[in-house]
Amino acid sequence: MEADFQVCRNCKRNVASLHFMLHEAHCLRFIVLCPECEEPIPESKMKEHMEVVHQQTKESQQHPAKCKFCELAVQLSNLDVHESHCGSRTEHCPHCNQPITLQVLSQHKAMCLSAKGRPEEGKRIVSSPGRKTRCDLCKQMIPENTYASHMKQCSAPNTVTRIRDESIIVIPSTLAFMDSGNRRSTVSKDVRPKTKNRNSSTKRETKKQNGTVALPLKSGLQQRADLPTGDETAYDTLQNCCQCRILLPLPILNEHQEKCQRLAHQKKLQWGW
């Protein structure tokens, strides 16, 4: 197949061997190569070709054009070289703050935004110092990066003062969130059940002859002696609530834990945790 074609010495094109002699004779006599585009042009039309094609091209190359990176006006003939140097400069991405060259900055921004909108599975999310979360115990808003240390202090065992002779337990206000309308530094509560003797003694009143009312006084030791031995032993045993960690006697611990867990669950539903 290569023998069927030959290269013309004038126009440098492949010509069929069957017509090669005729083509080369005609080409050497009437065809010349354009010095600008090196295209074979008839000699009689070379002047017109230079004026129409190459003169307009030269004039357009002198026109100013804006660089797509710095928007400066540069001659069109020098625009490619200018944009090559200008696009190699770097700027920080506004989303990830990484230095990116101007040539690929627009594509990087699109990828960066899509990556932020769809975080990868299994990727560890680092809590930022500005974000806050709510403590389940004290219900205070605390920074996420201090949540672990806060929980160690917030869930520490509470100090309980028990006065045996008057049957009073003084408990710090870790359950303040259970009663939003009544927040106090400490909660004092008589956890002893009321007995028939105690209720009847408080209801009976004896009027003296001078019109004054005399209320019978009963000491804490006397009230404690009225309780059954089994109940008294149960009230001497204190355990922590599994939710709020306060110490309570066994007879009221179960009821308290149910209420405490129910309120904590309602709080989580309310805040969308």
Swiss-Prot record:
Keywords: Apoptosis, Cytoplasm, Metal-binding, Mitochondrion, Nucleus, Tumor suppressor, Zinc, Zinc-finger. GO terms for biological process: apoptotic process. Its main location: cytoplasm. A zinc finger (TRAF-type) spans 22-80. Residues 181-228 are annotated as: Disordered. It is found in: Cytoplasm; Nucleus; Mitochondrion. InterPro entries: Innate_Immune_Apopt_Reg, TRAFD1-XIAF1_Znf, XAF1_C, XAF1_C_sf, Znf_RING/FYVE/PHD. Interacts with BIRC1, BIRC2, BIRC3, BIRC4, BIRC7 and BIRC8. Part of an complex consisting of BIRC4, XAF1 and BIRC5; the complex formation requires IFN-beta stimulation. Interacts with RNF114, the interaction increases XAF1 stability and proapoptotic effects, and may regulate IFN signaling. Seems to function as a negative regulator of members of the IAP (inhibitor of apoptosis protein) family. Inhibits anti-caspase activity of BIRC4. Induces cleavage and inactivation of BIRC4 independent of caspase activation. Mediates TNF-alpha-induced apoptosis and is involved in apoptosis in trophoblast cells. May inhibit BIRC4 indirectly by activating the mitochondrial apoptosis pathway. After translocation to mitochondria, promotes translocation of BAX to mitochondria and cytochrome c release from mitochondria. This is XIAP-associated factor 1. It comes from Mus musculus.
